[in-house]
Each structure stands twice: as C-alpha cells, then as structure tokens.
C-alpha cells in the first residue's frame, strides 16, 4: 500500500492551497517531492513528521517549489536529526543550499547526500524531463513487482507442506512422488504501484512517454486559459487530461492550481470530459493506492 499526502497543491504565491509539496509513503519510507514555503508547518498541521523523511526530490529551482527546503533542513538539524538525508534535484540545488547555509551560519549535523536516482529492494525513484520555462524534472516513484505463490492452485493439487511452498517461492524445482513441480507454474507476478509527479510542465510528448501506465499521475493544471498556461510553461486541466488519456494512466490528480481560482469546478469538468478518472488534489488530503494482483 502507498499513501500520497497532498501537503500543498497550489502554485505561484503563497495561498490557502499551500505551495507545492507531496509526500509519498510506503512502509516507513517517506519521500517528499518539492518543498514550497511553509511546507514544514503544513506537515505539522497534517500530523506528519518531516524528521522521518528519507528523500526529498525537487523538480526545479523556481521559488514556490524550493524555498521551504533550507528551513526544513535547518529544523531537522535543530531537532538533532542523525539519519542521512537524500536529495534529488537540478544541478543548482547543491550550490543553492550551501550558499544559504553559509549566510545563515547553519552547519548540518547530519549527512546530506545528493543523488541522481534511488533504488532499494522494494522501490526505485527516477526522474524524467518536463517542458517548463527552465530546466525541470518530474519524478517516478515505482514499487517493484513481487512474486506471490498461487496457494489455491497448490491446494487443489493437494500440496500444503510449507517447506515445498517456500522452495517454490525461492525459485527452486521440487520433486514429489516422481512429479517435478516447476516454480514458474505456481508463481504469480504482483505488479508494483507506480506514481508520477510532473511538477511544472506544459503538455508534451516526453511527459506522455515517461508516465505511461502509471497508477496515479499528478500533473500541472495551473490555469484554465490555455494561452496563459503555455506562456508560462504550464498546463491547463484539458492538457493534463489529454496527457493522462494518451499515457493510459489509471488516475489523474490536478495539481499546482493558480491562487486566482477559488472554485475548481470548471477546471475539473473540463478534465473529466477527456479523462473521467480525474480529481483535484485538495490541500491536506491523501490518496491511498493498494498493490495490484
């Protein structure tokens, strides 16, 4: 199971929706994507601990996506964080943080590692290029596929010995009464959950190709008017829905809503005409995705 917390879902200037910040949680692994101004305060409102964050990914260096990061790291230090923090982001991120820490006389008392991608036995996190006015990258959070034993099939064949089941799960051949059991005949692939977050982007083929078949696409939907969206390297809800449709995603969350819109009804209706399984990412809400069979 993966839970996506929409901490801040607005864009541009500070507003009631909050500035961009999304946390993805899987079995104790918390990853934060973007860290707009006020993120740590909104996390406290959400009863989420920023001390437990293991990885932070920044999409680009516009202030509404990154200005909350130095303060959060400084607070982690004040609270005596010991665990290393993994950072992903544009090439300017390292210099940006070093400069602020130097000028504010802050010296991190925990390790900060800047990495290009992340992978462990359960998940992998990678980036893809988006179409914004400056260098910008989206993020893919992917749960790895798992192998599951088809217990029902084994029971139908009268096999209940847990030692045999374990050997098959380990990929070993088993012989019983002259019959050879092959692991591939009893293993089911349990598909991992895949989530994509675009950050700021206009609609483009490179994003469509990067997010194909994901379970949840969190896509820029800043404006209603397309001319204004394209002028500033953003998308409208129609664009986001078109990307979702072309990429064959399962669900679409409209994100990075301009503070000029108090009511998102028109935005949502326009998107749902193209891609029905669309919702507006509301601030301080969460979305749960369970692993597929």
Curated annotation (Swiss-Prot):
Transmembrane region(s): none
Cofactor(s) demanded: Zn(2+)
Keyword Transport among UniProt keywords: no
Binding-site residues, Zn(2+) 1: 60, 62, 132, 200
Active site: 64 (proton acceptor)
Reactions catalysed, as given in the entry: Endonucleolytic cleavage of RNA, removing extra 3' nucleotides from tRNA precursor, generating 3' termini of tRNAs. A 3'-hydroxy group is left at the tRNA terminus and a 5'-phosphoryl group is left at the trailer molecule
Recorded GO MF terms: 3'-tRNA processing endoribonuclease activity; zinc ion binding
Co-factor: note: Binds 2 Zn(2+) ions.
Keywords attached to this entry: Endonuclease, Hydrolase, Metal-binding, Nuclease, tRNA processing, Zinc
Binding site for Zn(2+) 2: 64-65, 200, 256
Stored NCBIfam families: PRK00055.1-3, RNase_Z
Self-association and partners: Homodimer.
Family stated for the protein in its record: Belongs to the RNase Z family.
Function field: Zinc phosphodiesterase, which displays some tRNA 3'-processing endonuclease activity. Probably involved in tRNA maturation, by removing a 3'-trailer from precursor tRNA.
Protein name: Ribonuclease Z
